[in-house]
Each structure stands twice: as structure tokens, then as C-alpha cells.
Amino acid sequence: MSCRKPANYRYGEHTADVLVQAFGCTLEEAFKNAAVALADLTYYSERVEPRMAKKVEVEYDDLEGLLFKWIDELLFLFDAEKFAWGRNIEVELRQGVGYRISATLHGEMYDINKHGFTGLIVKAMTFHMMEIKKVDDYWVLQYVVDI
């Protein structure tokens, strides 16, 4: 199924922070692209080889909280474990009492010589300017990270 999303993701200007807009024909694809956008802020995800897989599961009552926990968990994965994920990410989103993401990220241990460094260090996820909406036939996830 194709849709008319403008891109997988894009960045916007924001004082001392970075605004990210991730797009997807489905919510799952938008959450995947939000993860790739986060990675590409610090290193070059296209250089990552799928040598290992990490499972990530997060849940929350609403989609905004789920997005916050998703990005926050990915920041922890990179900061604490030095795991660099590439663009091969499987995301399953379920709705019940709340929302739950079960994901598998394929990647390898971060190596600055291989994966590079863009010059940005993402410090934290914020709720500032967060927005999740459906536009025509695609989803937009907007979030701001502190750098």
C-alpha cells in the first residue's frame, strides 16, 4: 500500500533542541521512522550492519506517552549499551487498555570509526511540541529532543 507521505522523516529548527517529524503510511511505520530519525541525529544509520537484534517493549495509556517512552528507551539503548540500530526495525503496535509497542531493532555495537558522528548528542526526550496526527492517508509523529 502506498500513501502520499512527504518523506520518511525531516528535522525542524528549534532553539537548543531538535524538532523531528516522522512519517508513515501506518503508525508502525511512523514509529520506525521516528527511531531512524533519532539514530541519524548522532550517527549514520545506513552504515549499521544487522549483526545482532535487540527487543524493545514499551507501553502507555495514550499515543503521546507511548512515543515519549519509545524514544526514551532508544536513547537508553544507545547511551547505556552503545547499541547502534540501523534502518531494519520491525515494529508491532497493539491497542488494548492502552498502547504497546513490541519491536526488534537490528544493529551492532556503536563504532565511531564505522558509523561516524554527526556532531550532535541527544540528551533527552521532551513532551514539548509533541503531536501525533493522521494527515490524509499518512501519519505524522512530531517530537522534540534536547541536544
Curated annotation (Swiss-Prot):
An MF annotation (GO) of this entry: calcium ion binding
Record Pfam families: Archease
Keyword Metal-binding found: yes
Binding, Ca(2+): 17, 146-147
Source organism, top-level taxon: Archaea
Coiled coil: none
Secretion signal span: none
Single Gene Ontology BP annotation: tRNA splicing, via endonucleolytic cleavage and ligation
UniProt KW keywords: Calcium, Metal-binding, tRNA processing
The protein's role, per its UniProt record: Activates the tRNA-splicing ligase complex by facilitating the enzymatic turnover of catalytic subunit RtcB. Acts by promoting the guanylylation of RtcB, a key intermediate step in tRNA ligation. Can also alter the NTP specificity of RtcB such that ATP, dGTP or ITP is used efficiently.
Family (UniProt): Belongs to the archease family.
Protein name: Protein archease
